[in-house]
Amino acid sequence: MCGICCVVALSSQHTICDYFSKDLHCHLRRRGPDSSQQLIKTVSEPSYECFFSGHVLHLRGLMTPQPLEDVNNNIFFWNGEIFNGVHVGDSENDTEVMFRHLALCSSEADILSLFSSLRGPWSFIYYQASGHSLWFGRDYFGRRSLLWQLSNVSDGAFCLTSVSVNSESCNQCQEVPASGIFKMDLRDCATTKSLSLTLFPWKYKCTEKNEEEIFIDVLDQVSKDLPNHITVVMNESKLCLSAPVIPLNRTISEASVEHVSSDSSKTSSVVSLETLQGYLAVEHKRKVVHQFIDVLDEAVKRRVLLLRRGEDEGTGQVQGVSPRKAHVAVLFSGGVDSMVIAALADRHVPLEEPIDLLNVAFMTKEQTKRTGTTKNCIRQEMKLDLHRGEENHKDLDAKMGDDLSCFDVPDRITGRAGLKELEALNPSRTWNFVEINVTLKELKEMRRRFINHLIYPLDTVLDDSIGCAIWFASRGEGYINKQGEMKPYKSPAKVVLTGIGADEQLAGYSRHRICFRKCGPEGLNKELEMELGRISSRNLGRDDRIIGDHGKEARFPFIDEDVVSFLNSLPISEKADLTLPRGVGEKLILRLGAKELGLEAASILPKRAVQFGSRIAKLESNNEKAYHTCSRLKLF
């Protein structure tokens, strides 16, 4: 995982400093703490200058500083993981492998073929010296962040970067659409003093749409938010990338339609394991569930094994913890998504290695109001502040149980229950349940210093709530229970697994029930297709920036290409049944899988969004809508 940045100045009136500030360098460096390197490429006739700044988090193979440059003056940035499609040896670094393959490409079609073959998250920037071309883009789902800052004047500079700075003085910043990959002819841009982007869009291998329809739709989508002087054109050869997944199966059985019309108004409120057992008694259903478990298991396996384990640098940074440190952590609420991921990770992470379960809670509002007079919560806030700034915690008061009651939010309660279920599943594993407690004071401070820059350019109340919760959770600083005492702990894991993608594909949100009631299974299919289509702009770039800020890498098993293709191959009736009550009907196939894995309690837990389960949504304001612009993210 890396922090990458490229600034191109097309005229002497604009300098690199217009875009690359000390603050931006700091944010990039936090993403890649293991290596930092900069490079400037100056070209005359026509005149332009390129500045490259690369920062590496070393996770696989040999340490490879970025940017890479070859004998032909080509320059390459890679922020990604190759999980399949192109062979990467155990001792190889995928950045070098990709650069080597790019050097062998002799045409645009070769480059598209290479990127079409990749499986895994990526964003990249590639300067092709011979043609003065700058290529860049994100994977099909946009699992790695890439932003562009485009000048408001036609002869200006522009910037591509993993993360930006939320500043009034900055040029407008947007997420690079995950609609395909882009190419810029820098020689032409410098000559005409204008910016023009050539797009190579994604296309399903089998689709009813012809190229012209695809091109029109994608161009409209990409162009709508760009300044008027910036043009986006389709490549002249009408070349496309091959989408790494199959289209959504929209098949709806007659039985499903009849079931909706007769039973949708009679949904029972009773949630029971017997309901799930009834489904599993049907041979076809059970077979599909096991196929799903198998494909998801492979996705988790790739994500927990493809990382450098080498020599241990110490332990989990607390006395008395397992002598081996954790390399893998899970964003953990105890809900069915995170429970299944943790259980599957347990199959593949070496047994002697702990797994960190990161559980975040925000101080309940009632306690926040009383912090001026309530000794327990004042003392707790002081201890949390000490915990953030001090390395030596040996003398910390062990009698913290009473004080921590103000963090007993819903996700903390379900998280503890989930821990017990995992411990029963594998008592030989060290499960570090990390209780991450956040006060209002610390929330405001960390939002001001870091989080508002990472959420940017997104700006809604929902982005703020989710972004803050994920930032504190993935930081991994909290407490673990050792022999009945709460001990300070900081997770050393560099890989963070997250369950995002399950709700989007398996009708997990409450809005899906509303859609189903209004429009039936046809409407639900359209909604789910839209969910996955917009996940790059709504979720994944933001989450990558948030988690990457700690020098850690987000990995998304539910958005593995094989998992998505498998789920897309199934009709909606195999994945969810929204005539059933909450806690069963949504994400039905996942709940059935959880029961088969032995996670019975988790299998019938209703969906609870992180902003509600962690209680951040109630900490600062109760009168906001999720889609409102968040005033707390604005600069003052």
UniProtKB/Swiss-Prot annotation:
Keywords: Amino-acid biosynthesis, Asparagine biosynthesis, Glutamine amidotransferase. The keyword Hydrolase does not apply. Residues 2-187 form the Glutamine amidotransferase type-2 domain. PROSITE patterns: GATASE_TYPE_2 (PS51278). Residues 291-607 form the Asparagine synthetase domain. It comes from the Eukaryota. Pfam families: Asn_synthase. One of its GO terms (molecular function) is asparagine synthase (glutamine-hydrolyzing) activity. The active site is at 2 (nucleophile). GO terms for biological process: asparagine biosynthetic process. This is Asparagine synthetase domain-containing protein 1. It comes from Gallus gallus. The gene is ASNSD1.
